[in-house]
């Protein structure tokens, strides 16, 4: 994946404005989510996001050394020190709801539970850390041999989260938010994913795909 929407924020606002102008005509209620690496966040953009975005995804991979290894700036310096204060401000401005910090763990940080707990220590209450999807030839790619370590890490993370909740230090970890009476994961677990039911990817050239994972694979172009 790639692309930072705040690099062309005028288009973001144009999309929202256009959708709002046609939703009543088509009996729709559009909900917008924006994903950002935070480099270009400022007070004006935060205010717009809080007024127009149903959800916000803030890209942060956890500990400073982990984040800066995978998310360097154009000049090679790390991004952690620049983005964390902005993310904290935005999360607090949304009352710690309707957002999540989204990290990616790789072969480099199979001890990702430490990254989850680090983000919790930063004050974030909505946290998601997902496994990387990468070419197997990449040095940071996850291999089958890594799975026992990953499974153990999830178990240790569950223990840590339970301990913190008993101490009154709660936070939500997306993969553990399972409520069979209507939790956020239950529908996806039943149907596999939102492709074909609630999901559509639109490219900059206007091509349609059932999911962003398929973009560029012409056999899936709709």
Describe these PLM feature segments.
Residues 222:
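Cysteine-cluster motifs in flexible loop/terminal segments that predominantly coordinate metals
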Residues 1-5:
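Active-site groove signature of glycoside hydrolases
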Residues 6, 73-77, 141-148:
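Charge-dense, low-complexity intrinsically disordered segments
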Residues 138-218:
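A C-terminal junction/extension of Radical SAM enzymes
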């Amino acid at each position: 994946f790639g692309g930072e929407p705040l690099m062309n924020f005028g288009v973001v606002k144009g999309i929202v404005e256009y959708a709002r102008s046609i939703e009543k005509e088509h009996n729709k209620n559009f909900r917008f989510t924006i994903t950002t690496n935070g480099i270009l966040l400022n007070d004006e953009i935060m205010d717009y996001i809080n007024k127009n975005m149903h959800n916000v995804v803030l890209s942060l991979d956890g500990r400073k050394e982990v984040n800066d290894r995978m998310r360097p700036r154009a000049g090679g310096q790390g991004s952690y020190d620049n983005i964390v204060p902005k993310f904290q401000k935005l999360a607090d401005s949304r009352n710690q709801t309707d957002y999540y910090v989204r990290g990616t763990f790789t072969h480099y940080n199979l001890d990702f539970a430490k990254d989850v707990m680090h983000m919790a220590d930063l004050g974030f209450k909505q946290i998601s850390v997902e496994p990387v999807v990468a070419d197997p030839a990449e040095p940071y790619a996850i291999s089958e041999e890594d799975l026992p370590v990953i499974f153990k890490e999830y178990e240790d993370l569950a223990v840590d989260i339970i301990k913190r909740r008993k101490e009154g230090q709660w936070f939500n970890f997306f993969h553990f938010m399972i409520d069979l009476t209507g939790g956020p994961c239950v529908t996806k677990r039943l149907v596999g994913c939102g492709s074909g039911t609630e999901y559509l990817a639109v490219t900059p050239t206007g091509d349609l795909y059932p999911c962003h994972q398929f973009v560029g694979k012409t056999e899936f172009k709709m």
